[in-house]
Amino acid sequence: AIRAASGLSPLAMDGGLSAAADARCESFVAGGAFDHSGMTTRSEICAAGPIGSASSVCSYWQNSPAHYANITNASFTSMGVACWFCSTAEGQYTYWTVTFN
């Protein structure tokens, strides 16, 4: 819906990009740096914390200029998605990653 509102085509789901997103979430859960230094795709957006739903994290990304720019980048044609849940010292966390190409 976000891309359509900007006059853009929807992104196709890509299994390879989803595998890359999954690997990023796994790295975060294992204690890897929560940044974009390990990115292996053209672009990615990530979120972490006690975020309980996909709609909550999507609202966050939509209201963040940098994340919104990735979602509405006209050069992207495909995406992959992953989400991992884990227990931390701060409580239950969810790690979300969307990769783009």
Report the location of each language-model feature.
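Functional surface patches built around histidine and acidic residues
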Residues: A1-N101
